[in-house]
Amino acid sequence: MYSKESCERCEEMEKIIPSGQGKKSIFLSGSIRGGRQLLETYRFIYDALEEAGAEVLSWHVADPELEKTESKMTEQEIYARDLGLLEKSDALIAEVTVPSTGVGYEICRALVRKIPVLCLHMPDVAVSSMVLGNPDTLMEVRSYPDKEALKEIIIDFIRAL
């Protein structure tokens, strides 16, 4: 489990400890090392979740300063942080337009733990068959043509939790 003691170099620890009572805790998953070209979309998803009354535990995915923060952490600290946050989550929302081993791993871990998963992607992209072909009833895959549709999909998912 991720704790302040296990990551003394992580100066932003207080931001990742859940504080909201009664809010849905969401793990936001998106490509980090595979490319940050969708950072604006991650930020939009983060804002839509906050607006819907959810708490985003993995806020760092939408943080433009992520590389600076994570450069102070070991691989083991990042792994422990992310899995600790996933364990506390009511659901996982993954943006899967950009292929990412880490995102796929987080989706799989969430499903194994019986955590509902929403995978989002832009239209006309080659999303992995491991995502599109997954028959797990806890996983939903949705394409969004624009930000208005993206927000609506997110709000509907949160309300259904």
From Swiss-Prot:
Domain of life of the native organism: Archaea
InterPro entries recorded: 2'-dNMP_N-hydrolase, DNPH1, Nucleoside_deoxyribTrfase
Signal peptide (residue range): none
Keywords associated with the record: Glycosidase, Hydrolase, Nucleotide metabolism
EC number: 3.2.2.-
Catalyzed reactions per annotation: a pyrimidine 2'-deoxyribonucleoside 5'-phosphate + H2O = a pyrimidine nucleobase + 2-deoxy-D-ribose 5-phosphate; a purine 2'-deoxyribonucleoside 5'-phosphate + H2O = a purine nucleobase + 2-deoxy-D-ribose 5-phosphate
Gene Ontology BP terms: deoxyribonucleoside monophosphate catabolic process; nucleoside metabolic process; nucleotide metabolic process
Gene3D superfamilies, per database record: 3.40.50.450
Entries under Pfam families matching the protein: Nuc_deoxyrib_tr
Molecular-function GO terms, alphabetical: 5-hydroxymethyl-dUMP N-hydrolase activity
First-level EC class: hydrolase
Residues reported to bind substrate: 27-33, 42, 60, 106, 128-130
Subunit structure comment from the entry: Monomer and homodimer.
Similarity-based family: Belongs to the 2'-deoxynucleoside 5'-phosphate N-hydrolase 1 family.
Function statement: Catalyzes the cleavage of the N-glycosidic bond of deoxyribonucleoside 5'-monophosphates to yield deoxyribose 5-phosphate and a purine or pyrimidine base.
Listed PANTHER family: 2'-DEOXYNUCLEOSIDE 5'-PHOSPHATE N-HYDROLASE 1
Name used for this protein in its record: Putative 2'-deoxynucleoside 5'-phosphate N-hydrolase 1
Organism of provenance: Methanosarcina mazei (strain ATCC BAA-159 / DSM 3647 / Goe1 / Go1 / JCM 11833 / OCM 88) (Methanosarcina frisia)
